[in-house]
Amino acid sequence: MRHKNTLQKGSVRYIIFKEADVWYGVALEFNIVEEGDNPIKVMASLFEAIQGYVETARKLKMRPMPLNQKSDKEYEQLWDKLEEAKTLSKQEEVFSFGYTPFRDIAAAC
């Protein structure tokens, strides 16, 4: 099986969204979830967690599988819905979504 993400390069889909009074940040391929009361802080925390995850994988010379996990069905459905709409105006509970490449994560914060 050929993996999209490798230790050298790749990208991660992410979603920053609100449920009730809590903001969540999800990195789909890594199954990382961050939460907080501010979407910008949640996004920064999520990107920091992604960067740490990739750095640890590289340091341990892991196989690509942990960088290409199957994401939770709930988040996949939300991603598909957002991709279909391609607009945030209809999705008020979503602050941001997209792809972030491994190499540019630190610069995105």
Residue map of PLM features:
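Residue-level preference for alpha-helix termini and adjacent loops
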Residues: 29-32, 94-96
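Short, charged, surface-exposed hinge/linker loops at domain edges
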Residues: 1-12, 44-109
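A short, exposed loop/beta-hairpin motif centered on an aromatic-Gly-Thr core
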Residues: 30-41
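Short amphipathic alpha-helical "recognition" segments used for binding
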Residues: 17, 38-39, 52
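Generic alpha-helical hydrophobic packing signal
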Residues: 24-26, 35, 49
